Amino acid sequence: MALNSSADDGIKRIQDDCPKAGRHSYIFVMIPTLYSIIFVVGIFGNSLVVIVIYFYMKLKTVASVFLLNLALADLCFLLTLPVWAVYTAMEYRWPFGNHLCKIASAGISFNLYASVFLLTCLSIDRYLAIVHPMKSRLRRTMLVAKVTCVVIWLLAGLASLPAVIHRNVYFIENTNSTVCAFHYESQNSTLPVGLGLTKNILGFMFPFLIILTSYTLIWKALKKAYEIQKNKPRNDDIFRIIMAIVLFFFFSWIPHQIFTFLDVLIQLGVIRDCKIADVVDTAMPITICIAYFNNCLNPLFYGFLGKKFKKYFLQLLKYIPPKAKSHSSLSTKMSTLSYRPSDNMNSSAKKPASCFEVE
């Protein structure tokens, strides 16, 4: 949406260079429907994750701390979805005022950064736990995990400040509608470029490289261990799970990141073709649905890699209450993979033990 400023009358009045871009009847039906589905599935799934990890698993391991915070971040975002569903159903006419415009926009930005940072830390934690379990034991403590999560929430809040500052309600004169949008003055190109690059680099590229590196090193270490044990089927399982984790993250976010970059070019006037603007504005809410729906499934996806999580999750669905006493498991692992190599790979003759459990 390319916007030009016109006047100031309480709510700032602007002109839309491409007033029909992204405004299609099927979008006004499809996107609110998808938002509603994401809201129901996400609230239900992430609430169950919080209950299972906190009340059943007693929040005893580093991985469980990261997953709990991931679910909480998703819940914060999901609470804003009804607002965006109504906004889209009303054909991009914002009825909620300027304050809720800022809060709802910050909620989207906050979830992006918090979720990506938490997934990145989770991948680093898995690398340390699986490849260097002895060396990292003193660093991978509950206190360190909780402090890390506090820092992540603060960083995500800081990264969301531009949405609070620069997202506002505007009245578009040539469409006679009130919108909640970013609006950049034509002479100020630094801000949109900075925000776009921050979202692309800090919110995707840098975390993806860390996640890719961490799980590649995990796979290499486990592959070496399983070659010693001559356990090829298990090695194939490892590869499939790790590939699923990396590809799940990449394909969830890459469409949104690409169209975010194109949107910045439109805002700057680098792209002036209204046909391209229409494609971008039409695709943007669809990429948001893809990214955030997968985001909201992440706690379930990672949790179900663990046998104990699945066990307690099914107990919860059957209304079996958690035991009063916490379990005494000392495991600090996260998935159905069944070997945790020590720093000395030659000591892998014993029977495998689970290494991706959130126990």
From Swiss-Prot:
Record membrane topology: Multi-pass membrane protein
Cellular component GO terms, alphabetical: external side of plasma membrane
Molecular function per GO: angiotensin type I receptor activity; angiotensin type II receptor activity; C-C chemokine binding; C-C chemokine receptor activity
Lipidation feature positions (S-palmitoyl cysteine): 355
Glycosylation sites: 4, 176, 188
Quaternary organization: Interacts with MAS1. Interacts with ARRB1. Interacts with FLNA (via filamin repeat 21); increases PKA-mediated phosphorylation of FLNA.
Protein name: Type-1 angiotensin II receptor
Organism: Meriones unguiculatus
Lineage: Eukaryota, Metazoa, Chordata, Craniata, Vertebrata
The encoding gene: AGTR1
